[in-house]
């Protein structure tokens, strides 16, 4: 009789019999099968990400991410490809419900000279994915208890940018700039306190690897009595960037030791692309602690920008500087034209300043100041032409009036 009753037990939700399912869990007069339990878990998981504006359903592919980056970032093709794959894998890991124990988080280290687009890449990724984004400067950070910013303040910035929506903040992106500036003074462990170097790396470790952090909503040091907000950093993507001046020499030294007898043949290749051959041991030699390096499995290097790349940056991206100035002039009814030799002269000046694309805006502001001061008050101007002589301060911008009159500003 007991056997007969056992055979007729059915799931109270789907009606399947005990024989049709793997497990049948009994409650007080009700039963639920393993299939219905799985379905309930899926529904709960969907509700968990409902407020994240469809990013789970519409997670872009690496190619789609790369294509969007191309609209705003010129060159750096390999870095863009590495970032696209890493970001895709990171969010796939979150939204496909994979256990964090199975797949390591794809935190990213960007290595490259000043003005090569490290910050822009991180900003553009966050914009495309529509996730909260925060930028921090590693040079302002110190260990807790010392003058400076606590590492938890980075998380506070992210939380503020997410309008204190904890769930959104927990899938955000944090970019830490100047990370090379917190390298320890030597590659051997220090017996003295290094509160802005190794100490900061140790403090960052906790939030980078994933922890339940206590965030002071008004900043940590001035309001010690406030209540804390808990933020899980497990699914926050950390991107660190730095110029790592001097890293090339460390890499060359390592490669030189390994290629004795072949050095003359490989030297040219090494010189052209040294940073791309960076290994974790090089970063450790530079002064990053092994545990910190280990938390950034993805390393992308960015190349110094040449004249052609800088000209493209001036003209091609959706938010290119030349396009911005042309839009400003068009509001006053004036067409703004930059000649090819003017663009090349601007690129040369930027290279001379050794700050990459970062120099372009200040150079343009200097060139355009006088004419932007004049045009709103001057009637009848149809076109403004900027040529090489204008860039090099040998002439004023050429103004063409509607009655075909030409005048220098």
Curated annotation (Swiss-Prot):
Binding residue positions for ATP:
113-120
Q: Which GO terms describe its cellular component?
A: HslUV protease complex
Q: Which PROSITE patterns match?
A: CLPX_ZB
What the entry lists under InterPro entries is as follows: AAA+_ATPase, ATP-dep_Clp_protease_ClpX, ATPase_AAA_core, Clp_ATPase_C, Clp_protease_ATP-bd_su_ClpX, ClpX_bact, P-loop_NTPase, Znf_CppX_C4
Query: What family name appears in the similarity comment?
Result: Belongs to the ClpX chaperone family.
Oligomeric form and interacting partners? Component of the ClpX-ClpP complex. Forms a hexameric ring that, in the presence of ATP, binds to fourteen ClpP subunits assembled into a disk-like structure with a central cavity, resembling the structure of eukaryotic proteasomes.
Q: Any idea what this protein is called?
A: ATP-dependent Clp protease ATP-binding subunit ClpX
Specify the species. Thermodesulfovibrio yellowstonii (strain ATCC 51303 / DSM 11347 / YP87)
């Amino acid at each position: 009789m007991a056997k007969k009753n056992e055979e007729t037990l059915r799931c109270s939700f789907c009606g399947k019999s005990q024989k049709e399912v793997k497990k049948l869990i009994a409650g007080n007069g009700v039963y639920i099968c393993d299939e219905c339990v799985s379905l309930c878990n899926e529904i709960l998981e969907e509700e968990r990400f409902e407020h994240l504006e469809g990013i789970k359903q519409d997670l872009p592919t690496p190619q789609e991410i790369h294509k969007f980056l191309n609209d705003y970032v010129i060159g750096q093709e390999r870095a863009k490809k590495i970032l696209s794959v890493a970001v895709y894998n990171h969010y796939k890991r979150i939204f496909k419900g994979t256990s964090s124990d199975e797949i390591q988080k794809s935190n990213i280290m960007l290595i490259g000279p000043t003005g090569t687009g490290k910050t822009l890449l991180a900003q553009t990724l966050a914009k495309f994915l529509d996730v909260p984004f925060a930028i921090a400067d590693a040079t302002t950070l110190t260990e807790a208890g010392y003058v400076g910013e606590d590492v938890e303040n980075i998380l506070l910035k992210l939380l503020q940018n997410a309008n204190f929506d904890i769930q959104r903040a927990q899938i955000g992106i944090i970019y830490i700039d100047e990370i090379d500036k917190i390298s320890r003074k030597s590659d051997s462990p220090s017996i003295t306190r290094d509160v802005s170097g190794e100490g900061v790396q140790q403090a960052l470790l906790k939030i980078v690897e994933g922890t339940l952090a206590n965030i002071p909503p008004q900043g940590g040091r001035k309001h010690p009595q406030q209540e804390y907000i808990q933020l899980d950093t497990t699914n926050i993507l950390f991107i660190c960037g730095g110029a790592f001046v001097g890293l090339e020499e460390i890499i060359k030294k390592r490669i030189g030791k390994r290629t004795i007898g072949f050095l003359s043949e490989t030297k040219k290749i090494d010189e052209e692309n040294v940073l791309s051959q960076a290994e974790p041991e090089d970063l450790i030699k530079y002064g990053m602690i092994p545990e910190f390096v280990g938390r950034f499995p993805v390393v992308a290097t960015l190349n110094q920008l040449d004249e052609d790349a800088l000209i493209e940056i001036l003209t091609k991206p959706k938010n290119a500087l030349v396009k911005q100035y042309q839009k400003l002039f068009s509001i006053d009814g004036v067409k703004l034209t930059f000649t090819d030799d003017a663009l090349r002269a601007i690129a040369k000046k930027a290279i001379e300043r050794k700050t990459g694309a970062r120099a372009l805006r200040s150079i343009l502001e200097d060139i355009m100041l006088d004419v932007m001061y004049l045009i709103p008050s001057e009637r009848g101007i149809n076109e403004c032409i900027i040529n090489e002589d204008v860039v090099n301060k040998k002439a004023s911008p050429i103004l063409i009036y509607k009655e075909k009159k030409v005048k220098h500003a």
